[in-house]
Amino acid sequence: MPGNAITFFQPPPGSPTLGLTTALGVLRAGFVLVGNVPTDSNGVIQQGSLLVIDRNGKQVGSFTNQLGDPWDLAIDDEFDHATVFVSNVNSGNNKNGSVTRLNLRISPTGVSVIDTPTVIANGYTVEPNGAALVLGPTGLAYDANTDTLYVASTADNAIFSVPRAAGRTGSAGTGDVIFQDDHLHGPLALVFAPNGDLITSNGDAVKPDPTQPSEIVEFTKSGKFVGQFNVDAGTGGAFGIGIALVGQDTARIAVVDDNANDIIVIDQNVGQGD
């Protein structure tokens, strides 16, 4: 049965126009983080920020330092503190896509940055796109067990790994390519499956294949293709992904179909990853 959506956050009348992105995450303390990449009247990207919104839908803060147009994020949440990795499209330079690490202190009343934000990866391709505004580093997935951050770089059409993501003091460049083959068509969202594999959505902005439209692709962290399925018969439908374990051997995947403006929920058996 279809669900009903309600508006959680909307800026007050007269506020500057926002450009909310897929840099969206919820902290365990109830605060919502969301990227904002506004444009001017000519469609030119302006300075972006990361907004902090409380559980009642009220903005209580924002961050801009070391953030150039936040496009997506991943969170390692310890309740009273968190590490947040933010991918940035940094418009203006076609090899300037980056990932910034923020260390946050979380209290009942707000969120603040500890220490200086650190750019831990850079050099990802960024390019304008008529449908998406811009293509660049997008989905992020963090493995706390190995301190590795995985990056879905849309314009590069590849998945990268960045080592020592939580501890490094400087940039690793782009990191290492772990997955890049004909199953990728502009990867966007990136999440872990319960078995440890990685799952990405193909936005079809790069090397689209009409025989493989709107695909969700699973692969191991060592770069072995596992499987794929499509969520829309047309290209450009696969967008955001959420996933959770709902039984001992069952994963529930929620996928945004951007063509139909729907959220599709699928239950799948969980196989063993690498």
Outline where the language-model segments fall.
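Beta-rich, blade/repeat-based domains predominating
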Residues: P12-V32, D40, V44-S49, N65-V84, ...
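Short loop/turn segments immediately following beta-strands, especially the blade-tip
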Residues: M1, R101-S112, V162-G170, K221-G223, ...
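Short loop/turn segments immediately following the C-termini of beta-strands
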Residues: N36-T39, I45, E78, N88-N94, ...
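Beta-propeller domains
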Residues: N94-V99, N103, D115-V177, H185, ...
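Surface-exposed loop and turn segments in beta-propeller and other repeat-based domains
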Residues: P2-L18, V52-D69, V113-A132, A165-L184, ...
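A short loop-to-beta-strand structural motif that recurs across blades of beta-propeller domains
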Residues: G48-L51, G97-T100, A158-S161, D209, ...
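Outer membrane beta-barrel transmembrane domains
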Residues: A189, D197-G203, P208, E215-F219, ...
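Blade-level signature of beta-propeller repeat domains, shared across WD40, Kelch, NHL, RCC1
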Residues: G237-D274
